[in-house]
Structure formats: C-alpha cells, structure tokens
C-alpha cells in the first residue's frame, strides 16, 4: 500500500512505517524519558546559574564526586576550597557555612542529575543494541548523541574552570552559551529520533512547508545560543525597557561596537549582546507566524498546519515571557521560566520538522501500536 501525496487523505494509522521494529515503543518511551531528564538538567542548571552556585564545587571528579560531604570535617574541607576562589574573595566574603551549603547543593544536584542522565542513556542503549532493536540510522544517531553527551560533561567542567581563573566571579559567557546550546542540541536530537520511531507511516508535508519547518529548529538553536550569551554576561540587566532600549529602538553604533577587535563586540559588548537577542527573537517569531500562515494555506486541515500553529504560538509566548523577564529585571523565577520554556519551543519545532519530512511506509502491514509522545500530534496526514 502506498501513501497518497495529499496529506489530508492519509490517516496516521493507515500503514506501518518501514523503519519500525518490534520494541520501538519501548525505545520511543526511553527517548522521551531522556528528553524530560535533559529539560530537568537545563532547569537545574539555570537555577544553579541564577543563584550563583556554579563555582561552589572547585574540582571535577566524575566518579568520586557523586558522594557529597558527609560530616562537618568534609564540609570544612569543601568550604576552604571555595574560600580560595576569586568569587568568594570578591563577592561572597560574608557568606557562612550554611550559605555555602545552599550553593553547594545546587551545583552538586546539577552534576548528580548529569550522571543519572548518563546512566539512563547508556544502560538501556546497551540492552536495546544487544537485542537488535536499533536500526542502523537510529543506532548511528544514538552513538552520536552519546558522544555529544560525554563532550557536554567536559564542556561543563571547562566552563566551571573558566570561572575559577584569577579575577573571575562567574563563568565565561561564551562557554556558558556553548554548554547551554550543546544541551539543547542533545535535546533536539533525542526528540528527532523519538519522533522518527513512530509505528505508522506518515506522508511528507508539501515541500514549501517542509523546508521552513526544518529551518525553524536551527533558528531556535541560534536564539538559545544568543540567550546563553545574555545569561552568561548578565546583559539582561543592562536595558530593562521595551520595545526601546533606554529611549532608543537601536543604540548608536558607538555603543554597540565600542570594542576592538570588532568581533569581540558580539561576545563582550553587553549592549550588542542584548540587542542581538532581541532582534533574533523578532526574526524567529516572524518566521514562525509566516510559516503557520503558509501551512494553513498550503496544507489546510492537516496536522502539519496544526503543528506550525503550535510552534508559532509557543515562540510568541516565549518572546512575551522574555519581555516580562526583562522588564522585571530578571527575577529568578522569570529567568528560569524563560530558559525552560525555550526548550519547549525547541521540542515543538523539532517534532514539527521531523514529522514534516514524513515517515516512509512499509511494504505490508505488520501489527499495531499506538503512538505516544508529541508525534501523536501528527493526527491526520502530514
């Protein structure tokens, strides 16, 4: 049986997917569980950053570091290490042991969650692989994500180490942006693979819809990168007005480009860092809304049109949340919500992009399994 090219005529449960294998339901559930854990990592990492806790653990011990201080002597040792950091000497000299413990638990919890994510990835992965439940493409994608996850741990320590250098009271913004963007790439990869393991075939969306749908996750990732630079440099505290920036829509060039060499302005000039994040947000929302209108006209009534509308709605809501965060001078709850909601936008955009490509049909029907997760939004057709 072949799917028609009209996305409004094909039911998502009409034909089995060619790439589907027995047990893929468990694989799909595992991938979505990992995605949830990565979002939790981003949330805890955001809270760690916003509470200034990220430099409270001064060593990278991937194995033995899982055990926290267990008695007063252990806590004294860890506190002495922290008191030797520039952050303590410059910013936190008045902090006591109880205050240090609060900082420590945030960072320790973030690292512990990273270890848990690693175990939840590698143990089931080995089991699924041994049982032959992973096709070649899925296996390749998972191996790539596993390597990226290991690299992410190293990036995290490199980021922390940058904040322990003389004169530093926080991590380097560029390294923080890299850490956040890598986590986002891992999340997008997990969701992409999960959506691709749906049990039923799906006709691709019209080409014009498909092209823009695949562009949207890339735009969201760039915006997350720019947001990481804002977060790392605290550029969100420089201009707390909107739509203007302290009375002007665009700061003068002498303000935006006052550093030499020129390229450093895009990383270290707080005015330009915030301006770029604002400007790119407008671009993402404009593209998402235009895409939703395009999909509604080109594939009216299809699931692709519904998903496009969902991406546009989430992107617009995220921009509104970002504006509120800015106007409120970045309180912890708003900054954290803005960071986590960015992951929701990325997830929706990634699912939309993957399903817009379609899922090829098998030669003949072979059993049935109910789709779970966001790919169930495929509904009818593409």
Swiss-Prot record:
This is Heme A synthase. Its EC number is 1.17.99.9. Belongs to the COX15/CtaA family. Type 2 subfamily. Heme binds at residues 277, 338. It catalyses: Fe(II)-heme o + 2 A + H2O = Fe(II)-heme a + 2 AH2. It comes from Methylorubrum extorquens (strain CM4 / NCIMB 13688). The gene is ctaA. Catalyzes the conversion of heme O to heme A by two successive hydroxylations of the methyl group at C8. The first hydroxylation forms heme I, the second hydroxylation results in an unstable dihydroxymethyl group, which spontaneously dehydrates, resulting in the formyl group of heme A. GO terms for molecular function: metal ion binding; oxidoreductase activity, acting on NAD(P)H, heme protein as acceptor.
